[in-house]
């Protein structure tokens, strides 16, 4: 029988594994620490570190550990089997390794070869850190016993058990009694029984605040699980109940999707609550320790960040706070087979945001948010602070703020990031512990106490534990710079570091209200890697994309149709069935068919080869977890007779266009009925006044993807008899609401109302709403949706690569053409399938701005916006017909000046506020500013090699306040036979979340470079243009009958691409827009004659209105309205067949200037006089979509 040592209040029973041949004496070091309820014992791998804080004497025993490889798991519900370490907190070490107390244990020694001896020791680096890593702040101090292994002693062969001698300590602490009480006394090979399973204890893994964790074998299977045995002490009962309830809530979600540990079951064992978890391999701290605390390259930090941010996104959507995020609680699932695949563990400190108590001690100190230190109200943002500290620690190899006390913690933060704002300090309940008011000043301000002052008041001596002391976070980019990179790889590393620091500063924003959210984090350029697309041939970039492969969704049998998970759409294959059938990528989550009847949507899971990103399937694909943080609350939205009750996927933008009439063609140019919904976290709905039939769509239709590069749309036009496909994109944008009945009646309280011509644009109304649940189709309402081919744009930087990889561009459109509410193009192949049902009604026109710069008008405060919804409106100012387009973005002057810090040095990309700068809209699909193959010489933005200059501090705030307006100003052309049309409605896009139009230098696609600083919201509307070449990219259109809309997408650090949408045509005479401005009062001079004489009856009627006097000489822009006629369309170059041309080439004219105040000579390189569309005599190409289903005509414009 193993000896029993009696402590002051409880017994410690020590067992030694019979497989060991020797015992060990141990000595106890007494260290002054701050006792707390949050000590962690993470013993794992070949080394274990044991912290004991109790009045009982820990006995040194070689702790057992598992073999690196785990047993195979035949259970299909487990995709992989790992071992887990659950960091714990306080409590004394009762047993480090236990064996049977009788000879029976010796007989069972054979199978115990799974257990190997490991060292129980204290890591030297922890001593350097002051041994305060996981301790909490308490006024009194106590002893901590640190176990050290000593040379082995003689084994007692008679008993078969090694007897260890332990020294005793008289040190006690005031709180050690409660911490030590309630722990379950473990015995190795003990059996824990639940209602359905039995588990045999294999070894002790760790101890936490609320219990201990053991490794167990699930009898009857070869599954290894981790069981957390909670204390039964009353002081922990309530928190244990909260943890169980949170785990129960999380168990309804896909743990693999959202990257948190999977809990299998909960049961009672001898009055102790036992939680059964999947086994994971190693925590991040042990991983760092194993690698000698060497800094982790950014290419490895990125997948860890993405996965943890995905978990935080889900927790935020559930209103949960983890409250103890740190490297010890981020587990590597299987480092050997799935490098950098991580999951979040330990929800023992978690709580619901509504139950967050101010002044509560939460989080480990190194990762404690300022609001916790200062005693401010807090929310889920504290987890984002912790994550920022974690990734900084991975980057540095050392904690960023390793405070030995809370005073040191806030001192470190203040020295690097500045003092917290005055209003935060004044509101904090614990501010006076660390700050004093300067009473001598007439305006008393807070100042940080000096270390001597704090020591005099508290007796706690301040220590310096930092390895790096930064004056600002930007200085972090200079440390640990690798020296083995050369050429473009070094540029990639520098660009990556800039984006990393930019994201880190947003995560470590002291004001929690301004701190970046998980969804915004997932859309930051550092995570989406848009800044790396400037270096397509860099092996370093390829490695970065390959490392992100681990974030892909993995489908396993755990996700069956019986699981209540939200399905996610990828590229949808065409279907000819009569009901709404959709095909999902099998790397997305499970299909959950909630259709109440056969007439509802049915969803099939298929097509596993479809890529869900803008990269080839061999490259990075997103985690479906990031694709769908699904809000749990349901909010049906009523609009007339239409009801939309969809489940929001906040990390994806879904566009749903559902006109009311499904029996026939009922839409008209003057009254377009339908719904246009852009879905996101706060999901506003785009409604249009006419009543519609109730529409319900499966949650899967509201799809979502993690790596934003466009928008995802589901287009359901009326009177379509079959669903042929749905184009999906990845983006995060807020939806906007545009009721047509309000046009001309309501006006936005923004800058446009100060202009004579601006107050009469179609008003825009936002109705933020949370779409939850699902939407089903009414009975007997089959739909037909054309497939929009999602182009894949491959970034290239050399002429040769552009020519050699043109064919790859069709599947690598980094920008993923956005197919939005009323934009569609029917391919020749697809039009035959849909022409009998509903003709195509709009064209998708793209161009490629080689230098989309952020330009702000010098209109002063006039350009500032007061709308909190952060809307962006696109203003189209046509003057006379022209095939060319230039873009002027009018940003609000609320943008902070510091955003100009990294402004590009290009002469084209002027980043100063209150100035007007030009944007070159580049026609060539071979748009690469580094070569001269294009007819227009385009200046390359300096930000291409500088992380796109998006790492300024004000970008987030700018997103919240800036309201840029985009004006499309084509050059002046005086062709009387051409008439233009202005869009019917303008759709603002909320930019609180970053859109993700990827920038690319592609061989056959647009180069959407954006020169705005820090995502200053220059919504540059560009038109994709296709240059004649051997490889043409086809865009397969989506047909719909919606009003023409402009959607300006934007996001911090990304590049925007906006589409021009062609409205359904009007058969009646041209009309003018009701602007009060004198220049807007009449129809364009060219309109009346040209509409009647110059156009065939089947050609589009084009409408226009005169530009304002200030921009009257700058040109016009065309938006085409199709008239009655063909169901198919092509814009053809003479030498190419109709099947390959689906884009409108637009040439750049010489007289395009964004403002009369800028001389043409300032932009000689942007507006070249030549045009390469020689096939078009008028240098313009128009595309129209007639409405008549009876006629099928094509008009190759030559």
UniProtKB/Swiss-Prot annotation:
Tissue-level expression: Highly expressed in heart, muscle and kidney. Weakly expressed in a ubiquitous way. Down-regulated in several thyroid and breast tumors.
Name of the gene encoding the protein in the UniProt record: HIPK2
Family: Belongs to the protein kinase superfamily. CMGC Ser/Thr protein kinase family. HIPK subfamily.
Phosphotyrosine modifications at: 361
Locus of motif Nuclear localization signal 2 (NLS2): 832-835
Induction comment from the UniProt entry of this chain: Unstable in unstressed cells but stabilized upon DNA damage. Induced by UV irradiation and other genotoxic agents (adriamycin ADR, cisplatin CDDP, etoposide, IR, roscovitin), thus triggering p53/TP53 apoptotic response. Consistutively negatively regulated by SIAH1 and WSB1 through proteasomal degradation. This negative regulation is impaired upon genotoxic stress. Repressed upon hypoxia (often associated with tumors), through MDM2- (an E3 ubiquitin ligases) mediated proteasomal degradation, thus inactivating p53/TP53 apoptotic response. This hypoxia repression is reversed by zinc.
Keywords: Apoptosis, ATP-binding, Cytoplasm, DNA damage, Host-virus interaction, Isopeptide bond, Kinase, Nucleotide-binding, Nucleus, Phosphoprotein, Serine/threonine-protein kinase, Transcription, Transcription regulation, Transferase, Ubl conjugation
All residue ranges annotated as the Protein kinase domain in the record: 199-527
Biological process, per Gene Ontology: adult walking behavior; anterior/posterior pattern specification; cell population proliferation; cellular response to hypoxia; DNA damage response, signal transduction by p53 class mediator; embryonic camera-type eye morphogenesis; embryonic retina morphogenesis in camera-type eye; epigenetic regulation of gene expression
Protein's name in the database: Homeodomain-interacting protein kinase 2
Modified residues (Phosphoserine): 16, 118, 135, 441, 634, 668, 815, 827, 934, 992, 1041, 1155, 1188
Extra facts: Interesting targets for cancer therapy. HIPK2 deregulation would end up in a multifactorial response leading to tumor chemoresistance by affecting p53/TP53 activity on one hand and to angiogenesis and cell proliferation by affecting HIF1A activity on the other hand. May provide important insights in the process of tumor progression, and may also serve as the crucial point in the diagnostic and therapeutical aspects of cancer. Tumor treatment may potential be improved by zinc supplementation in combination with chemotherapy to address hypoxia.
Paired cysteines (S-S): none
Species whose genome carries this gene: Homo sapiens
UniProt main location, coarse: nucleus
Biological function: Serine/threonine-protein kinase involved in transcription regulation, p53/TP53-mediated cellular apoptosis and regulation of the cell cycle. Acts as a corepressor of several transcription factors, including SMAD1 and POU4F1/Brn3a and probably NK homeodomain transcription factors. Phosphorylates PDX1, ATF1, PML, p53/TP53, CREB1, CTBP1, CBX4, RUNX1, EP300, CTNNB1, HMGA1, ZBTB4 and DAZAP2. Inhibits cell growth and promotes apoptosis through the activation of p53/TP53 both at the transcription level and at the protein level (by phosphorylation and indirect acetylation).
Chain residue ranges for the region called SUMO interaction motifs (SIM): 884-908
Cellular compartment(s): Nucleus, PML body; Cytoplasm; Cytoplasm, Stress granule
Autoinhibitory domain (AID), as annotated region: 984-1198
Renumbered residue ranges of the record's region Interaction with UBE2I: 873-907
Region (Transcriptional corepression): 97-230
Segments for region (Interaction with HMGA1): 787-897
EC id: 2.7.11.1
Ranges for region Interaction with SKI and SMAD1: 539-844
